[in-house]
């Protein structure tokens, strides 16, 4: 338990300068969301202004630095949260932010536009629901 607390403190200490500089008004943290049409639910890490733009902000840890191409599922997930939040609040979120802290303390910031990933979200959901229907 002590090691876990120390690791969490390290992550917090590494992220703090980024958060102090870039984060603005926080709309929610660790909030349960759902989407009636998509029939999905989840718990978003944070919805806040990032560099002045309302954003879904997701925090990740990694053993090593990540290539942008490795993050596609994270972008799809964050886009889903943006859609869920919009359905619940009628506030549109166009920007998604993934913050990754590696074991050596490196912080990576990936900022994307939600619309780039909505077709992939639709594709993933269609594949899932087709699997559920067919039982395969």
Name each model feature, range by range.
Residues 1-2, 21, 88-91:
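Structural motif
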Residues 3, 25, 38-40:
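Residue-level preference for beta-strand/loop junctions
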Residues 12-34:
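Short, conserved active-site entrance elements at the starts or edges of catalytic domains
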Residues 8, 24-27, 75-79:
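A short linear-motif detector with a strong N-terminal bias
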Residues 31-135:
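Mg2+/Mn2+-dependent nuclease catalytic core
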Residues 1-11:
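Single conserved hydrophobic/aromatic residue that forms the stacking wall/gate
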